[in-house]
Amino acid sequence: MALPKNGGNSSSTKKKVSYISVPSQIINSLSSSSLQSLLVSPKKSSRCTNRFSYRNPRIWFLTLFLVSLFGMLKLGLNVDPISLPFSRYPCSTGSFDEHHAVSHLAFASKNDTQSSSSSEHRKNETLPTEGDFWKQPDGLGFKPCLGFSRQYRKDSNSILKNRWKYLLVVVAGGMNQQRNQIVDAVIMARILGASLVVPVLQVNVIWGDESEFADIFDLEHFKNVLADDVHIVSSLPSTHVMTRPAEEKRTPLHASPQWIRAHYLKRINRERVLLLRGLDSRLSNDLPSDLQKLRCKVASQALRFSPRILELGNKLASRMLSEGQYLSLHLRMEKDVWVRTGSLPGLTPEYDEIVNSERQRHPELLTGRSNMTYNERKLAGLCPLTALEVTRLLKALEAPKDARIYWAGGEPLGGKEALEPLTKEFPHLYNKHDLALPGELEPFAKKASVMAAIDYIVCEKSDVFIPSHGGNMGHALQGQRAYAGHKKYITPNKRHMLPYFMNASLPESEFNRIVKDFHRESLGQPELRTGRGGKDVTKHPVSECMCSDRRQQQQ
């Protein structure tokens, strides 16, 4: 299926030219020989014929008509065909919003796409910089390489035979936050030499999604991929059902394997069942090489979405891909995001007051650094980009105006009004509700985690991905796109950009140059995770989980 094109927007030119235009239907109706006869002077005729023509008034009228037509054609043919003010759809109003309201998503025919390919090719030739936006970074030949050490494989034999101690975990937060905790749960089970019971997904107080592990992820695939690393069971065996687990809620941030063994190994050996809660960011980012590889294996290979979610997500991605390249944005503009980040949407004073009131009623929702003002947070790069700021960023990065854009995320505070700056400059903007056929999303209407998984799939398959505000989904996709060959991932440099966003006197051309320069090294190129800088290996898989023969040859 093909996405709709906004035929009402003609290409802009650097200079406005006054001209008399001739409808393309007239020009096309003339054969090449007819045009040639009009443009080439006729041969001299005989004197007898001239006398006859001189005395015949009909010849005078015919000559006058041909001269007039010749003048009109000459003026028309001198005009750049790209600048002719004719829409590809003669009856189109050019209004995206009206067209979008009539039918969620209309799809152009294949023939229509083919008929315009030559004109679009010429347009691309006049705007060569547009191709740079879609250009992929050099992955330096890095590919996944998860070769575990001999000692790791030897230890696996004894760990997998152990069926008498079990680790239970409860993971909280949104889908991507839960995903990170599941990865760490597998690592902790390996460290403790315990079998892992399939993690329990805690119902989130904001989204209220009661989905279980198997509703979101492919459970059998999860077990099979990790069969050589950790023994995974769906539930406690009958011999342990009546056992009261030792519960722990106070695991410190960034705990090392040594700390976990020192504090939990005796307890799980004694009680046989250990229950852990609140695992978010509890496991250290700096682990032994084999455990880092296991982290990558869980995140990039074992945690595959359930078949039902994969099928729908792939369908929506195929609809975006049906006409070629597309960009995906993760927009964080929901009310709870503005509240939690201590930020303001900047739409109207009324919307700012809504956010401030909600934050005063629920101060516990504010995530960290509560002593900072909104302006301090904004300048520190701790606030999500607004739709206007995303638009200016895309223009500075030379995104084509006709780029097809998929935006992921929940309903923005302010609805369509919040997205207006983006839709005005980039009208081909879609989300999952626009792409889905009637009834396709209905089974998941109240499943926020499933909706997030669908967004994840469509964003993962895009040619370019840009998050408006970090977050767990952005981090997960950064690692996944790197693992898939370093597909383009643009990290907005908010802290450096924002002073220029606020400088109203800065010419747009200078603003664009500065912003583009800020992002030359933030396009998804391989980033070595050297030393112990605390970077998450699932976000930066080079070089523990990826290796390159080409890089070794260059060295």
Swiss-Prot record:
Transmembrane regions: 59-79
Pfam families per UniProt: O-FucT
Tissues with expression: Highly expressed in embryogenic microspore and in vegetative tissues.
Glycan attachment positions: N111, N124, N371, N503
Residue ranges annotated as Lumenal topological domain: 80-555
Top-level division of the source organism's lineage: Eukaryota
GO MF annotation, one: glycosyltransferase activity
Reported consequences of knocking out the gene: Increased number of lateral roots and wider stem diameter. Altered cell wall composition with an increased level of de-esterified pectins.
Pathway membership, UniProt: Glycan metabolism
EC number per UniProt: 2.4.1.-
Residue intervals annotated with topology Cytoplasmic: 1-58
Stretches for region Disordered: 110-130, 525-555
Role noted for this protein: May play a role in the biosynthesis of matrix polysaccharides and contribute to the biomechanics and development of the plant cell wall.
Family under the similarity heading: Belongs to the glycosyltransferase GT106 family.
Name this polypeptide is given: O-fucosyltransferase 20
